[in-house]
């Protein structure tokens, strides 16, 4: 395979790593169609590109559930609405097929998401989840699932204000039906159902630029198994380097280094929850977890074998029993098609973390605080990379959100081509830093004030 073909393979991989079905490149003016050109979004309560936010808060006038229609939005006569029961194996399989075949545009890449029942139990069944918020569109005649969108309830923190919301995810329309304008109808229908439950705000992300991002972060990627990535043509060989050079450069030890590092247990929840809340309070856009939500997100199904495990959570316990650090990552592997040697590509995603390393300082940006935090995060996330590799993951991904820019360069996370834009629905907010400089390099000085992590 030529280097040009390998570069194309890598480009396709990076598209997949964006976890959305739209292509993206750098944030350019060309992508920013004027609001008047966004036919759908100009009718929605979202911030305009050039709007100067004076006061943060809801965009729409207050409403009640009684103001919202009880009837689903009309569809073309050949389609019908359905609610997906994620506990039903057949219905869940329909979602897998739809996402696998349509969630990413380029099907020549030779790889697909390997969605599992375990992943969706974790992602879609958080406390307070509603079957009615897992919405599908089927062809009446064949019952084929051709579109899907989901929402889960969350409480957002936006610069200290609590905002009851939903998190929108897994919006997917069959490629052959994208001219039917199903996406706006899906968004309106999920909005209607959520509004009927007296929730009026939402958080969502996309690789494309819509009106108008509250923040933008960049994807970064840390090879854990460079040789495998090269053998399946997901990465090329840089000029002036040998395979041995690249393997050595990305090598990791088999064992972690941090004393007291162990898996998170249920009996740790009270202590870790308090550590996590205090750490998250530094950021301007966060999810405010209940203790029940925290346990669901970070304990997972303990009885699962390693190859089916979704969430991996660890703590650092000191000799006196105090837990000073916590980190987590999740797994969403790819299936590799048409490869005789490898069937799967293990993909790990850095999730949430917390540490008390800089708690003694009043200002997180104090040089001494920054040094203490950077040192500790480099140690913790280095161990996270080792644990991810030991869990058969081949690439470890992180955004420039949270305090990630303090360790990305040191730990050999390379910048990806993908950018993730964060959006608030029916909530006007001033821009929030996403860990990027104007030239899209990592902003180590200001870091990011995005503390929420979207799947």
Swiss-Prot record:
It catalyses: N-terminal glycyl-[protein] + tetradecanoyl-CoA = N-tetradecanoylglycyl-[protein] + CoA + H(+). Changing residue 205 to A: Reduces the chemical transformation rate. Pfam families: NMT (PF01233), NMT_C (PF02799). One of its GO terms (biological process) is protein localization to membrane. The N-terminus is blocked. InterPro entries: Acyl_CoA_acyltransferase, NMT, NMT_C, NMT_CS, NMT_N. Inhibited by diethylpyrocarbonate. Competitively inhibited by S-(2-oxo)pentadecyl-CoA, a non hydrolysable myristoyl-CoA analog, and by SC-58272, a peptidomimetic derived from the N-terminal sequence of a natural substrate. The keyword Transferase applies. Tetradecanoyl-CoA binds at residues 38-41. Changing residue 170 to A: Reduces the chemical transformation rate. The active site is at 455 (proton acceptor). Its EC number is 2.3.1.97. GO terms for molecular function: glycylpeptide N-tetradecanoyltransferase activity. It is found in: Cytoplasm. Keywords: Acyltransferase, Cytoplasm, Transferase. Residues 168-204 are annotated as: Myristoyl CoA-binding. Optimum pH is 7.5-8.0. One of its GO terms (cellular component) is cytosol. The keyword Acyltransferase applies. It is an enzyme of class 2 (transferase). Belongs to the NMT family. Monomer. Has an ordered Bi-Bi kinetic mechanism, with myristoyl-CoA binding taking place prior to peptide binding and CoA release occurring before acylated peptide release. Cooperative interactions between the acyl-CoA and peptide binding sites of NMT contribute to its extraordinary chain-length specificity. This is Glycylpeptide N-tetradecanoyltransferase.
């Amino acid at each position: 395979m030529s280097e040009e073909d390998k570069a194309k393979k890598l480009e396709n991989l990076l598209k997949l790593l964006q976890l959305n079905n739209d292509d993206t490149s750098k944030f350019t003016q060309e992508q920013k169609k004027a609001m008047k050109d966004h036919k759908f979004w100009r009718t929605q309560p979202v911030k305009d590109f050039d709007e100067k936010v004076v006061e943060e808060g809801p965009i729409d006038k207050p409403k009640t559930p009684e103001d919202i229609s009880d009837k689903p939005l009309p569809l073309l006569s050949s389609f019908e609405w359905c609610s997906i029961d994620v506990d039903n194996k057949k219905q869940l399989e329909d979602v897998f097929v739809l996402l696998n075949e349509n969630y990413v545009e380029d099907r020549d890449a030779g790889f697909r998401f390997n969605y599992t029942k375990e992943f969706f139990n974790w992602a879609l069944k958080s406390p307070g989840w509603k079957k009615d918020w897992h919405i599908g569109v089927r062809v009446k005649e064949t019952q084929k699932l051709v579109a899907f969108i989901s929402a889960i309830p969350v409480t957002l923190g936006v610069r200290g204000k609590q905002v009851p919301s939903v998190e929108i995810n897994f919006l997917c329309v069959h490629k052959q039906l994208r001219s039917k304008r199903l996406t706006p109808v899906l968004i309106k229908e999920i909005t209607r159902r959520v509004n009927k439950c007296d929730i009026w705000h939402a958080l969502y992300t996309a690789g494309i630029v819509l009106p108008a991002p509250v923040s933008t972060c960049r994807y970064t990627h840390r090879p854990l198994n460079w040789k495998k990535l090269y053998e399946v043509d997901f990465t090329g060989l840089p000029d002036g380097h040998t395979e041995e050079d690249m393997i050595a450069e990305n090598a990791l030890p088999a064992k972690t280094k941090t004393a007291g590092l162990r898996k998170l247990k249920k009996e740790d929840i009270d202590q870790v929850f308090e550590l996590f809340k205090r750490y998250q309070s530094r950021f301007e856009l966060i999810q405010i977890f209940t203790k029940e939500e925290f346990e669901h997100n970070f304990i997972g199904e303990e009885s699962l074998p390693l190859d089916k495990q979704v969430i991996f959570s660890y703590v650092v316990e000191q000799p006196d029993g105090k837990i000073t650090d916590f980190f987590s990552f999740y797994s969403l592997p790819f299936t590799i098609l048409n490869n005789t040697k490898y069937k799967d590509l293990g993909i790990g995603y850095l999730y949430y973390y917390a540490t008390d390393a800089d708690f003694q300082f009043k200002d997180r940006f104090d040089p001494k605080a920054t040094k203490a935090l950077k040192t500790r995060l480099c140690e913790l996330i280095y161990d996270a990379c080792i644990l991810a590799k030991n869990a058969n993951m081949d690439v470890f991904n992180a955004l420039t959100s949270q305090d990630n820019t303090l360790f990305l360069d040191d730990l050999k996370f390379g910048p990806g081509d993908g950018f993730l834009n964060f959006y608030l629905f029916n909530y006007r907010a001033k821009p929030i830093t996403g860990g990027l400089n104007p030239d899209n390099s990592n902003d180590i000085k200001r870091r990011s004030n995005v503390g929420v992590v979207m799947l």
